[in-house]
Amino acid sequence: TLNCKLSKDRSGSLARESVVQKSQLLIATEIKEISARGNRSKTLLNLASAIELKWVEELFPDDITTNLECKYDPGPKRIEAFKIKRFRDLEVKREHESKVDPKAAGLALAKACLHDWFKPKSFDNNIKQQILRLNWICVARPDLEFPPFDENAVLRCLAKAFEGMTLAKQAVVANVKPSFRKHMPEAQWEWLDEFAPNTIDWPNDQPKKLHYPESPTDRNGKIIPVELHVKLHECFRLDKHPVICERHIVRFKLLTPKNKKIDFCD
């Protein structure tokens, strides 16, 4: 193949007339961007010479690192362990390893999960709502100092739940809820239920479900209100507009008796 990996997570194509097309390692003295189909650019490598890894190791010993890493293979749906040697950030050698580090395997499965290769059955709507509620209150009430559920936090929770596993089918049936619950102390979960509840009481009726936004703010940085889907005639029972988190008004999504949207009401 003419495709080559470059440093800084870049890639390029070796010139077709190059005589080092079969070399595992090479150095190109000319790198340029050219126009390609579809108004795209292409990185072309010219004037390339084959090199050996031992030369690089002798010249730049301090820039060579070797790490044991785990990667998820979507084919067999399992974790593979490798010993990877890098020159700075560029991978120059990879060897299979029989021994798998439990924490590294859990992290690799967690990354695969976030890339939608599989989904744990226990990662249900309750967890998704916890994430939305927590992220919303982090923006609505930063003074309460809740720890947000950003991507890194979700990754850590999944990695802990998958620790020691090597197969996707193991991760699919794993119970991830305890790991997510440990994201913050139990007292803070109780505060979350108080300030950003799942439901809100309704006069002479069952509690109604609150809908938290996927993103707590809009493109201008303004906090997006929490929504309540309610039929218009049900609002006549209220004597005041509901609020949560002490001062944030709940936005009503008003519906007809047949659940067709009428309008929003703040």
Please report, for each region that a protein language model flagged, where it lies by residue:
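Acidic, serine/threonine- and proline-rich low-complexity intrinsically disordered segments
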Residues: 1-3, 8, 24-199, 242-266
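A structural detector for beta-sheet-dominated domains
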Residues: 73, 203, 213, 229-231, ...
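Short, surface-exposed polybasic-aromatic patches that bind anionic ligands, especially phosphate groups
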Residues: 200, 204-212, 260
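Segments forming glycine/polar-rich beta-alpha architectures that bind adenosine-containing cofactors
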Residues: 1-36, 194-195, 207-231
